[in-house]
Regions:
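Conserved pre-ATP/AMP-binding loop-to-beta segment of ANL
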Residues: 130-147, 154, 177-183
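Conserved AMP-binding/adenylate-forming
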Residues: 25, 42-83, 188-189, 390
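Conserved AMP-binding A3 loop
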Residues: 28-30, 143-167
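Gly/Ser/Thr-rich phosphate-binding loop
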Residues: 230-231, 243-301
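Conserved AMP-binding/adenylation subdomain of ANL enzymes
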Residues: 166-183, 191-231
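AMP-binding/adenylate-forming catalytic core of the ANL superfamily
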Residues: 101, 337, 342-343, 365-448, ...
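Conserved AMP-binding/adenylate-forming core of the ANL superfamily
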Residues: 16-47, 54, 58-60, 85-90, ...
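Conserved ATP/PPi-binding loop(s) of AMP-dependent carboxylate-activating enzymes
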Residues: 308-312, 323-354, 389-391
Length: 482
């Protein structure tokens, strides 16, 4: 089975029901099914199945059409960020070695001399097949390639199977209480897998998605006022944007949130401005998928928790010896489910660190109480979640250490009401911080640029000679680095 397998049924029984609504068009299921089939045939025509495509496109129907069409044809799609710098693009393309690149016409200046076959958005209509004849695949092939990072700070490509996401779709139905009648607003970029998943899961279940081509609080509220929205996928930046504008809404809508955990002050403000709304927070990762969910009626009494496990997930919390710990005791969180990723592309060594038999771990430190509520106490990999985007300190640290005069550098995530977390850089060396920031602007995506900069005379170190992240964090929180 494929993530696109249900489209034909909806085209037959709900042919006039909108599948996708944007500020520019409405696409009913009958048209959506036809577009996906013709697009799949176009991919198949290139070189058959089990190939890879890199997509560099803005939010909209065309992106979803190409992603779904590639999935239907047995291809795997890498979702590229149009904000990536040249080096970031090259690193990722070298890893996945795509058979085809499809990019926005605004990127012709970059891709026009690419050795990989490239199609631009203004050429799609000519490329698209008029018929939908192609060999159907069985859904066992990977369909999605994303990027995460490990201790080296270098991006690693991870792969997802159709079956893992289809199993996740069951969580939407059972744990998030979603039906085929949903009207789901997708306000964020498909670069973030939260929003891509939100769109594709809704289409699989037969609902209608409303896609913002570009986010703004005003546009989100316009869609809430003008359409029968029942669910909204959000990350902390979107929530804070709504709060900053002071919007008030009494619609019965549910907000589904991932990313950095909401601060209690943010939750309180949301309940004042959206008094009849429901809130769902879920915890997971690129490798693990869904792990826990904190439902609306649990938000106050268990505010510090990430919730209880989804109905199709098992967890185990273990000490350094691999032994399961007792209730309330800290340990490394292990997860068992059918939603786990397939592994890292061409990186068996790193895959084995995550996938361990039937279990998997990203080395988050957790504990569980007697009622089954899970608490995440820290991340062994120190990942920062900035506005729903995953940022890995090691990647930024590597850039900082290449700058002349930098002797030592460390990057941390610090709590922020708007972003959830923001990036802070601590530098030892005879350098100009404005010059160092300009250097980062030339070598990192804009969202990875540190928002807080501090120079340090000396760092605290561990016995192994590494900078002690916990001690630096304590210094900062006590105002010792101001």
């Amino acid at each position: 089975m494929r993530i696109t397998s249900t489209y034909r049924t909806y085209a037959q029984i709900n042919n006039n029901r909108p599948a996708i609504v944007t500020d520019k068009e409405i696409v009913p299921y009958s048209e959506w099914y036809d577009l996906v089939q013709r697009t799949a045939a176009s991919f198949y025509k290139v070189t058959g199945i089990y190939k890879r495509v890199a997509l560099f496109l803005p939010n909209g129907r065309l992106f979803l059409q190409l992603f779904a069409g590639a999935s239907e044809a047995g291809w795997a799609s890498m979702v590229g960020d149009m904000r990536w710098k040249e080096q970031e693009i090259e690193e990722r393309l070298q890893q996945i070695t795509p058979d085809l690149i499809i990019a926005d016409e605004k990127m012709k200046g970059y891709f026009h001399q690419s050795s990989t076959k490239t199609i631009f958005s203004d050429e799609i209509e000519e490329w698209l097949c008029s018929s939908s004849d192609f060999q159907k695949n069985d859904g066992n092939a990977p369909f999605y390639i994303g990027f995460t990072s490990g201790s080296t700070g270098k991006p690693k490509a991870f792969i997802r199977s159709h079956s893992s996401w289809i199993e996740s779709f069951r969580c939407n139905q059972i744990d998030l209480e979603m039906t085929e009648k949903e009207h789901v607003l997708i306000p964020g970029s498909f670069i973030n897998s939260t929003f891509l998943y939100g769109a594709l899961s809704t289409l699989f279940l037969g609902g209608t998605i409303y896609v913002l081509t570009k986010f703004s609080p005003a546009r989100l509220m316009d869609f809430l006022h003008n359409y029968p929205i029942s669910k909204v996928y959000v990350v902390p930046t979107i929530i804070q944007g709504l709060l900053n504008e002071g919007y008030y809404n009494e619609q019965s809508v549910s907000f589904i949130s991932t990313g950095a955990k909401w601060l209690p002050s943010v939750k309180a403000k949301m309940r004042l401005q959206f008094p009849t709304a429901n809130f769902y927070e879920f915890y997971g990762s690129s490798e693990l998928s869904f792990v826990t969910v904190l439902k609306n009626n649990e938000q106050i009494q268990h505010a510090a928790s990430v919730g209880r496990v989804f109905q199709n997930v098992e967890i185990s919390i273990r000490n350094d010896k691999g032994e399961e710990v007792g209730l309330g005791e800290e340990g490394v969180l292990y997860v068992k489910s059918k939603m786990l990723f397939d592994g890292y592309l061409n990186n068996e060594e790193e895959t084995k660190k995550i996938l361990q038999g039937d279990w998997a771990t990203v080395y988050d430190i957790a504990k569980i109480d007697e009622e089954g509520y899970v608490y995440i106490l820290g991340r062994q990999n120190d990942m920062i979640i900035y506005g729903g985007m995953n940022i890995y300190p090691q990647e930024i640290e590597q850039v900082l250490m290449k700058y002349d005069g930098v002797e030592e550098a460390i990057v941390l995530g610090i709590k922020d009401e708007y972003w959830g977390e923001k990036v802070a850089a601590f530098i030892k060396g005879n350098v100009s911080l404005p010059s160092l920031k300009n250097y980062c602007l030339r070598n990192l995506s804009s969202y990875k640029i540190p928002r807080v900069w501090r120079k340090v005379a000396n760092f605290p170190h561990t016995t192994g000679g590494k900078i002690s992240r916990p001690e630096v964090r304590k210094w900062f929180e006590k105002g010792g680095l101001e």
